[in-house]
Amino acid sequence: MAAALRALDPAPARLAVAVSGGADSAMLAVAAAAALPPGCTLRLFHVHHGLQAAADQWAAQVRGLGALLGVPVDEARVTVPPGQGLGMEAAARLARYQALAGLARQHGVRHILLAHHRNDQAETVLLRLLRGTGLQGMAAMAPFSERDGVAYLRPWLDVDHAAILALAGAVRAQCGWQAVQDPTNTDPRYARAAVRTQLAPALDARWPGWQAIVARHARQMAEAAEIVAEVAQADFATLEPADAGRSFSLAAWRGLSAARQAQALRHWLASQDAPMPTEARLAELQRQLRQLHALGHDRHLRWQHAGRVVRCERGRVWIDD
């Protein structure tokens, strides 16, 4: 923890830990409080979803932890809206990140620590593999990421869950503070809990320590994804981009290999803040662009995606709002 905080440059004046009340995030708060660099203040951010009957008790436990550590606790209450085309897990996660960003703005915090650990990382890789994710998805969770103007740090991605639980037991024995238990963590109706309770035990029995191997795989995928992204960026720069990257040369794009065409399209869409399409949808756009006649002008090409329109005119491919 101390090494992760020292690596921040410039050193932040304020840090926050996202704390649910469970053992993982609570012990991250304990570790952060112990390793806090001079001149830096710490806060605990708690998001109250109201999804569990014990949600009020969880909030009270977080306040108790804050009092124990001498750290202020800030709470945001959110309602997880149904029917966004997301499952309950994904909808709650989205609401949680939005609430954390709001708390960060309110308190002038730029960096938030998250308690994801090696076992979480391994579960994420397995889930994404089973869902058929691509290279970037197989990189799983990054030690550092930015979202909504907030820098999220995951200093425990290489820490085994057993070590965290051992620390929680020591804190309970010494201070009497008890972490809450989220019943969804072991409810197999939820995908992650199904991996944790049904798949992981079989892997533990056959391949002890498999989480470290899978986490290493995620790091390797992250490196490969970074290389692919750099190649895509370099390729796109050769496509004669114009109008702040809104358009590029169809003829130049056609000069790329099929795999690099697809990556250049992904880079282009991401640079224009367009949601990333599925592999099938992207393949359809690629097919249409490759089949346009040589002049690259086809008024019938209107590939629509997430409120945006891709069109081709005078040999250039455009994206419009």
Swiss-Prot record:
GO terms for molecular function: ATP binding; tRNA(Ile)-lysidine synthase activity. GO terms for biological process: tRNA modification. It is found in: Cytoplasm. CDD domains: TilS_N (cd01992). Its EC number is 6.3.4.19. Pfam families: ATP_bind_3 (PF01171), TilS (PF09179). GO terms for cellular component: cytoplasm. It comes from the Bacteria. ATP binds at S20, G21, G22, A23, D24, S25. It is an enzyme of class 6 (ligase). It catalyses: cytidine(34) in tRNA(Ile2) + L-lysine + ATP = lysidine(34) in tRNA(Ile2) + AMP + diphosphate + H(+). NCBIfam families: lysidine_TilS_N. The N-terminal region contains the highly conserved SGGXDS motif, predicted to be a P-loop motif involved in ATP binding. Ligates lysine onto the cytidine present at position 34 of the AUA codon-specific tRNA(Ile) that contains the anticodon CAU, in an ATP-dependent manner. Cytidine is converted to lysidine, thus changing the amino acid specificity of the tRNA from methionine to isoleucine. This is tRNA(Ile)-lysidine synthase. It comes from Bordetella pertussis (strain Tohama I / ATCC BAA-589 / NCTC 13251). The lineage of its organism: Bacteria, Pseudomonadati, Pseudomonadota, Betaproteobacteria, Burkholderiales.
